[in-house]
Amino acid sequence: MGVGHSLTQHPLLSVEAIARLAERLPEDRVEHNVADLPKVVDPNAVRQRDEPPGEIARNIERNGCWMVLKNIESDADYKRLLDECLDEVAPYVRERDGGMTEREGFIFLSAPGSVTPSHTDPEHNFLLQVRGTKQMNVGRFPDTETEQLALEQALGGGHRNVNWEPADPVTFALQPGDGVYVHPHAPHWVQNGPEVSVSLSITFATPASQKTRRVHAINARLRRLGLSPTPPGRRPRLDRGKVAGFNAMGRVRALKR
């Protein structure tokens, strides 16, 4: 679903502002790689540059990199920006899905021609194009079994990348001021245009998406034990038991801290 926005000139989304934010964020909240990649790639095969994150951001026009700044809401200014955006859609989400939780923001900074390989993300996501152009290719899983195994991997502690191209992709050609809504877990890949790209991703969870994530996480554990777990949605009572188990494990981890 296409959307529009008015953030193209926002001072917090300039390359220099993003570079300064990259220098402030914890090291594990900034990720990058050299982005001359195919649409499907082993995450262990990507290369990185041995430079500070701020310099990678400032030199994005010529270093061939892709960078993501995660959980930008940990910075007060960016949290205000995130909340301003999500507050506009929160009433509709509350009416349709029962509430909006886990508000998070991500900034993507991409060199000309870079590729973000096929992957999935667990959140409801509005991707807003701020600078440059890109093609967002959103598809589907080829079959139910592939979907189950991929999501168990991603939500059970594995990588978000998938080892196949999304089936029947729909391409969204994004210009500054454009955006697209991406449903949780929808497989997609991204081709950047001929200029530096800046994109803001504003994400959230709902009760239903939280439940699905937790069932997949428990299913991943069950599969490692040699079992063949039932996918979310087929047996609601069993799903409720898995969610209760996930929540109980979270409480145990909290007590151990």
Language-model region placement:
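Transition-metal
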Residues: 1-83, 218-227, 249-257
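A gly/proline- and charged-residue-enriched helix-loop-helix capping module
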Residues: 74-107
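Conserved short histidine dyad/triad with adjacent acidic residue
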Residues: 106-120, 138-143
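A generic "binding-loop/recognition-motif" signal
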Residues: 112, 122, 186, 196
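A short beta-loop-beta micro-motif enriched in histidine and acidic residues
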Residues: 115-125, 167-168
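Double-stranded beta-helix
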Residues: 129-181, 185-187
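Short, compositionally biased
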Residues: 151, 193-204
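Conserved double-stranded beta-helix
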Residues: 171-172, 202, 206-257
